[in-house]
């Protein structure tokens, strides 16, 4: 596992930081921590902001 940071692409705001296996699982982990089942369950306006997960080196 690696440490990932999820940022809102439009303004660079950090939405989540934590460990995950890859970018997809980082987005899912962010959504679960916010109380959703996975990334696809997030409201459309959040997904439309195009959150981006990147590993922290």
What is the predicted function of each stretch?
Residues 22-25, 38:
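Alpha-helix capping and helix-coil boundary motifs
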Residues 1-13:
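Short aromatic-glycine-(Arg/Gly/Cys) micro-motifs in beta-strand/loop hairpins
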Residues 6-9, 24, 46:
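Intrinsic disorder/low-complexity segments enriched in polar/small residues
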Residues 26-30:
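Short amphipathic, charge-patterned alpha-helical segments
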Residues 12-21, 32-34:
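A short, exposed loop/beta-hairpin motif centered on an aromatic-Gly-Thr core
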Residues 32-57:
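Short, mixed-charge low-complexity intrinsically disordered segments
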């Amino acid at each position: 596992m690696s440490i990932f940071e999820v940022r809102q692409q439009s303004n660079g705001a950090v939405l989540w930081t934590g460990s995950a296996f890859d970018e997809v699982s980082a987005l899912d982990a962010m959504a679960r921590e916010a109380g959703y089942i996975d990334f696809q369950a997030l409201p459309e306006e959040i997904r439309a902001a195009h959150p981006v997960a990147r590993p922290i080196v």
